[in-house]
């Protein structure tokens, strides 16, 4: 599943291109009771309803692949008789005409979706005639296959905000009646997955609006798929590993974390020419960690601790390098570095101006004195005049890393 696949499906969710055949659903209260069922021919909906439901369907294909959109695979056991994959295949083939199958689906969601409050389960059925494309992406007037799929959206239903309004029957301003409003979906899925412009019956596309809490319990217990962590979850886990290994020093932890992220960012940049949208991104394995941290001066004991925790956390499924990077933090750090470089450049220019100013001594001035000194501004306060053995002397202390030049001769 790629952004290109998602985009191809999503572009069809328009009034003149939409081919949804049916839409059905169930409204569930906070006691997990079904209050209302609906089953409609989608194209017969009133215009306003049509667009509202279409907008909900679009949301299930929104977000970032790998973070809000996950490709979940079915274990072999779920593809056997009685498995969830087989059940979804039957539901898709029924065209939503089998009420018993629909009720079983609603109960499957209600029993395995951990949510407190009212929500609406929506199901859309579609058959997309996938047209053949040439190498330059031009469409040919012939069908490659018919991609038949179901789209599910789970939408919270919340009370509208309290407020004042015009009460027509009483002809006055008063507290308005609060309605139960269907919100954009929190979760959803498309089955089967659409991959390389074809149906993949061994997996589905899972949608999570909140990548921090994607409802992993529904992925596994509800849909029967092997749960996956979102990019956000993987990044949070990785950052926790680093912080726990380094200790309580927040300043050191933040600096080391930033340096590690810069190393990972360079790794991604180095593979830019090799990593394409259609292929798997570069991953960070446990064996790759030492090379990412050797130039950051992290103690060997800390590196080993990070490696152990990393393997325990991610095992045989290492995360993609791009998932571990906080792009906003990296951008802010880059700006900070630029500001520091600029400050140093300004300081150097100031120093050069001071030196030039000191050097601009006229010949008359030089002839007036027997000794003319040119020193850096910070050395002026260290110069003393003392009488030594009856002779007036100038004392200029020199540090170990300092040198002096007298009329072109280095002392």
Give, region by region, the residue ranges found by the protein language model:
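Extended, charge-rich low-complexity regions and/or helical-solenoid scaffolds
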Residues: 374-411
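Short helix-onset patch at the extreme N-terminus, typifying the N->h transition
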Residues: 6-10
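Leu/Val/Ala/Ile-rich N-terminal alpha-helices, chiefly Sec-type signal peptides and the beginnings
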Residues: 13-28
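Long, hydrophobic alpha/beta structural blocks
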Residues: 24, 28-360
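Phospho-regulated, Ser/Thr/Pro-rich intrinsically disordered or coiled-coil terminal scaffolds
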Residues: 1-4
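Long, contiguous regulatory modules within eukaryotic nuclear regulatory proteins
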Residues: 348-388
């Amino acid at each position: 599943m790629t952004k290109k696949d998602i985009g191809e499906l999503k572009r069809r969710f328009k009034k003149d291109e939409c081919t949804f055949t049916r839409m059905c659903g169930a409204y569930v209260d906070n006691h997990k009771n079904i209050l209302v069922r609906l089953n409609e021919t989608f194209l017969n909906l009133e215009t306003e309803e049509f667009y509202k439901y279409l907008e909900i369907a679009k949301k299930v294909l929104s977000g970032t692949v790998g973070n809000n959109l996950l490709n979940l695979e079915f274990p072999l056991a779920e593809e056997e008789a009685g498995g969830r994959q087989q059940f979804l295949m039957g539901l898709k083939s029924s065209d939503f005409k089998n009420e018993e199958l629909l009720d079983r689906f609603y109960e499957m969601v209600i029993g395995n979706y951990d949510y407190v409050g009212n929500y609406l389960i929506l199901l859309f059925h579609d058959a997309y005639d996938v047209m053949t494309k040439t190498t330059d992406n031009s469409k040919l007037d012939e069908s490659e296959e018919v991609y038949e799929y179901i789209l599910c959206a789970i939408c919270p239903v919340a009370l509208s905000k309290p407020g004042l309004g015009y009460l027509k029957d009483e002809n006055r301003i008063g507290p308005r009646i609060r309605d139960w409003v269907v919100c954009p979906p929190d979760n959803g899925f498309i089955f089967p997955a659409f991959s390389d412009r074809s149906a993949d019956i061994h997996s589905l596309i899972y949608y999570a609006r909140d990548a921090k809490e994607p409802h992993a319990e529904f992925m596994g217990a509800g849909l029967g798929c092997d749960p996956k962590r979102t990019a956000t979850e993987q990044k949070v886990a990785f950052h926790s590993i680093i912080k726990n290994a380094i200790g309580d020093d927040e300043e050191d932890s933040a600096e080391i974390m930033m340096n590690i992220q810069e190393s990972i960012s360079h790794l991604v940049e180095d593979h830019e020419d090799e990593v394409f949208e259609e292929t798997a991104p570069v991953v960070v394995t446990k064996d790759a960690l030492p090379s990412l941290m050797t130039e950051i001066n992290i103690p060997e004991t800390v590196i080993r601790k990070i490696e152990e925790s990393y393997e325990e956390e991610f095992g045989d499924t290492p995360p993609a390098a791009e998932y571990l990077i906080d792009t906003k933090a990296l951008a802010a750090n880059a700006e900070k570095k630029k500001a520091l470089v600029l400050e140093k450049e300004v300081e150097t220019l100031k120093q050069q101006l001071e030196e030039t100013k000191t050097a601009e001594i006229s010949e008359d001035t030089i002839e007036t004195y027997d000794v003319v000194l040119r020193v850096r501004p910070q050395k002026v306060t260290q110069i003393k005049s003392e009488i030594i053995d009856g002779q007036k002397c100038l004392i200029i202390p020199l540090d170990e890393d300092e040198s002096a030049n007298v009329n072109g001769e280095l002392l």
